[in-house]
Swiss-Prot record:
The gene is aaxA. Keywords: Amino-acid transport, Cell outer membrane, Ion transport, Membrane, Porin, Signal, Transmembrane, Transmembrane beta strand, Transport, Virulence. Pfam families: OprB (PF04966). One of its GO terms (molecular function) is porin activity. It is found in: Cell outer membrane. GO terms for biological process: amino acid transport; carbohydrate transport; monoatomic ion transport. Facilitates L-arginine uptake, as part of the AaxABC system. The arginine uptake by the bacterium in the macrophage may be a virulence factor against the host innate immune response. The lineage of its organism: Bacteria, Pseudomonadati, Chlamydiota, Chlamydiia, Chlamydiales. Belongs to the OprB family. It is a multi-pass membrane protein. It comes from the Bacteria. This is Porin AaxA. Gene3D superfamilies: Carbohydrate-selective porin OprB. One of its GO terms (cellular component) is cell outer membrane. Residues 1-22 form the signal peptide.
Length: 461
């Protein structure tokens, strides 16, 4: 059965499914950052939460009054005319003024992540005669602990216009990663792991998003063009961002993913009902790293395709989300193999203080050393009602190692267990001690475990 037939069947079946018209939330990594509210003055009341969940769309056919319509120059004019934040400058008042006057939402995440790891040295696997044609002695791999990472991720969304013809929004997000001392990639080699100890194992610059989105009236259809990444939708609230949730590679993203970190393309998103979301799109196949915007690649006529379906019901326990992502990548010089991948995510609030999630993902081909992963976990937000940033989580991931992609693999599976506790300090700063336990490292047959201790300091505005 071809990928196109599978995708078409899945989308058609979901589009005709009768779902409950109730509270829902479709996860998007950068949209969620822009909407977050950690300041106590911004926290919504229970009544507002109920209204927001139960009426996320305004499906009224009545035209928007002229007094409420926004033209192209409205953001600039409104910002100049309303400078109330100057009476008392603060981060909250500045963000509120930008949102109300200029239709602009901004978010900034800056984290510092030192990680202590053990073991700190190992002997590289001995290459066989079959590999190189001759025997070669083992070499010693050493790394100094800790490795220190800093990650800077600003995001912004600017509403260009909002009228009876629809809404136009420009979104931008950039990720900058730097290291002191050792990198996480070298630390992972020292511990002989198949997966990294964090989401960004080396120095990186990623232009994750630069898009223009046209939302049509009734907000059921959205067309987006520009540079984007599937990482923004492939996951749930706490297993897709190492700055806010879990840190390890297998629990902070899809470890089997072979799609781009950011590439030019377009996608169409449709909401058949209030609790369902369907998306189909394509991207330039050549830009794998997403380090820059490469316009010339669009003329090379090789594209990756994806289909995405999400169902976000609201049951008696609370809101949840269940999604499926299917994608195909083409063979290009930067990625010398065509692949087909999938990712199934499920998350559910059992109560306001307990959130459970799971992921099953996989990929064909020999590009990724991890070709299947099964993960699950639970998170408790603000358990003590002390600070909105407080978060406690524990999760486990079982990674299936692809022997053909990892010639030195000594084991077929590698397991990571992780726990963390985020402690909020005011509305914007938090500290999170984190512990990772790796059982049966894939490349280290003489060791049963490896350990990583981390303390994440994060500024989230």
């Amino acid at each position: 059965m071809s990928f196109r037939s599978i995708l078409l069947t899945a989308l058609l079946s979901l589009s005709f499914t009768n779902t409950m018209q109730a509270a829902h939330h479709h996860y998007h990594r950068y949209d969620d950052k822009l909407r977050r509210q950690y300041h106590k003055k911004d926290l919504p009341t229970q009544e507002n939460v109920r209204k927001e969940f139960c009426n996320p769309y305004s499906h009224s056919s009545d035209p928007i009054p002229l007094s409420q319509q926004r033209g192209v120059l409205s953001p600039i004019c409104d910002l100049v005319s309303e400078c109330s934040f100057l009476n008392g400058i603060s981060v909250r008042s500045l963000k509120q003024t930008l949102k109300n006057s200029a239709g602009t939402q901004v978010a900034l995440d800056w984290s510092i992540l030192p990680q202590w790891f053990n073991p700190r040295s190992s002997w590289a696997p001995k290459l066989s005669i079959r590999d190189l044609g001759y025997g070669k002695p083992q070499s010693l791999i050493e790394a100094d602990s800790p490795c220190c990472q800093t990650c800077f991720n600003p995001s912004a969304a600017i509403t260009i216009y909002d009228s009876s013809c629809g809404k136009g929004v420009v979104q931008v997000s950039y990720t900058l990663v730097r290291y002191w001392r050792e990198t996480a990639a070298l630390a992972g080699q020292t511990m002989m792991l198949a997966g990294s100890i964090n989401d960004y194992p080396a120095r990186q610059n990623i232009f994750s998003q630069l898009t223009f989105s046209q939302t049509f009236p009734n907000e059921r259809v959205n067309l987006t063009v520009g540079q984007y990444s599937l990482y923004s939708i492939d996951g749930t609230l706490y297993n897709n961002d190492q700055q806010l949730g879990f840190i390890s590679y297998a629990l902070s993203q899809n470890p089997t993913a072979t799609y781009s970190s950011g590439s030019l393309g377009a996608y169409l998103q449709v909401a058949p009902t209030e609790s369902t979301c369907l998306q189909v799109g394509f991207q330039d196949a050549y830009n794998i790293s997403g380090s820059s915007i490469k316009w010339n690649n669009l003329t090379k006529n090789k594209y990756n395709f994806h289909g995405y379906a999400s169902w976000a019901p609201h049951c008696c326990l609370g809101p949840g989300q269940y999604s499926v992502l299917l994608y195909v990548t083409r063979k290009v010089p930067e990625q010398m193999m065509q692949t087909m991948g999938w990712s199934v995510n499920a998350s559910q609030y059992i109560s306001s203080k307990l959130y459970v999630f799971g992921r099953y993902s996989g990929v064909t081909g020999q590009l990724s050393p991890i070709n299947r992963t099964y993960s699950f976990g639970l998170v408790s937000p603000n358990l003590l009602n002390r600070n909105p940033q407080d978060l406690f989580g524990v999760a486990c991931a079982f990674n299936n190692i692809h022997a053909s992609a990892f010639q030195n693999a000594q084991r077929k599976y590698e397991t990571v267990i992780e726990g963390f506790a985020t402690i909020g300090c005011g509305p914007y700063i938090s500290f999170a001690p984190d512990f990772q336990l790796y059982l049966y490292p894939a490349l280290r047959p003489n060791k049963q475990s490896a350990r990583v201790y981390s303390v994440r300091a994060n500024l989230a505005i």
